Amino acid sequence: MRSDTIKSGFEKAPHRSLLKATGAIRSSSDYRKPFIGICNSYNELIPGHTHLQELGRIAKEAVREAGGVPFEFNTIGVCDGIAMGHIGMRYSLASRELIADSVETVAEAHRLDGLVCIPNCDKITPGMMMAALRINIPVIFVSGGPMKAGHTPEGKTVDLISVFEAVGQCSNGSITEGELQNIEEHACPGCGSCSGMFTANSMNCLSEALGFALPGNGTIVAEDPRRLELVKAASRRIVDLVENNVRPRDILTRQALLNAFALDFAMGGSTNTILHTLAIANEAGLSFDFSELNALSAKTPYICQVSPATMAVHIEDVDRAGGISAILKELSSIDGLLDLSAITVTGKTLGENIANAEVLDRSVIRSISDPYSATGGLAVLYGNLAPQGAVVKTGAVSPQMMQHSGPAKVYNAQDDAIKGIMEGDVKAGDVVVIRYEGPKGGPGMPEMLSPTSAIMGRGLGDSVALITDGRFSGGSRGACIGHVSPEAAERGPIAALQNGDIITIDIPARTMSVALSESTIKERLAQLPPFEPKIKRGYLARYAQLVTSANTGAILGHL
């Protein structure tokens, strides 16, 4: 066992003395057992994490019952919703790297034999996955579970996105402040990751398809007693994984990634899943290119439409309809789409995991013969504005905005764009451009939920598009095209845009372009002053120096 490095032999007497002082060692026989890290992300700042302390306690008990010795430690976490719309959002994506580095540090420094990872919200799950693949010791994921959707006294179903969009509605006078407060009070009824197919829930659902989590991980709500049973089962299972030396890189094959992307496209997951999955693939040493995604999307039907694409369905409804296993079972009937032989942490193949799954509500999970669209709910666009690609959540774009051409309304910062939208500077037909908000330019590639919600709230969702080198919340909806690569800070073509330039978006054709010649774009870029970093001290300054483009997952490169 790896942990023998810190516990076996007379030379390790000082180490054993310290281990006894932790209280985790109950008898000398514990030194013959695997040391299991309980990697918890409990904190009181994120509603999706406030209940994780109890899950950690249950996990420790289950590990001990299964024959392991548990040691709990914590990671940081950022609530994207609370960090939204101010400087805090610049730290969100950057926190993923800190989480990965910190989990790696603890597991390697203490020679842990395996990990039970308890994440929930946006950057915590991918950060822990990146670390798991980096250190490559047995691991199992069990998330905190989704929040239930909210309901107003009048019976209206609401969620966090309802509140963001209601701010825009209040600003243009379509609802009163009292009506806004009513939505605010009922949108988030309890603990859990926000209730739609936003980034947190998307990643926790993908954990099942990747093979890192037990069935039910992505959809059983946080307050459901079955969530506690899932924690127990996962925590018992890690001891078997250690004994059989089943490691993350054994599970995360190229085909497992394709399985996850197929699920992602079928349920219209957050655009951030592409960013994170590329970063996870990098840690596994797997090369995966943006351009491959459209080919997979072309043969993956969009069969499960969840908020923000519709307010009629939330994650709890997906669970009731059969969960992720039911979606995968439906997809498995498409010849060659899924690799059902992929191994998983259950000890069974993906095919065995979903063998008995069935769709219990066809209004939530459609048949592959009756999809919302014949192609997946995410797409990569290319053109002279995004030579290296840009990402759009097609499942949340209205039919009339699938093709759009209009004049650019250019902003060099998200705050300026929000002000312009709220003050009425953005008109029907415009294409809002928010640049210098990419991984380097932001820095941190902040999410654009506030401007997209303002557009929707002001009734412009069917007439205004938004493109950015930043990214979007999983809760954004509308013609929102992000991850434009190269970004403005790296002299990408988006930096050459001027107000009034005509931008054409053709999502079915997977293209996005501006009506400018290549020579004009080059001339404009040559006239720009050198990019000046917005933040010059602290972690974000270091992050901006090392981070790579969005089309590679916005991972940290090397000096």
Swiss-Prot record:
It comes from the Bacteria. One of its GO terms (biological process) is L-valine biosynthetic process. Disulfide bonds: none annotated. Binds 1 [2Fe-2S] cluster per subunit. This cluster acts as a Lewis acid cofactor. The keyword NAD does not apply. Pathway: Amino-acid biosynthesis; L-isoleucine biosynthesis; L-isoleucine from 2-oxobutanoate: step 3/4; Amino-acid biosynthesis; L-valine biosynthesis; L-valine from pyruvate: step 3/4. Its EC number is 4.2.1.9. Homodimer. This is Dihydroxy-acid dehydratase. The lineage of its organism: Bacteria, Pseudomonadati, Chlorobiota, Chlorobiia, Chlorobiales. The gene is ilvD.
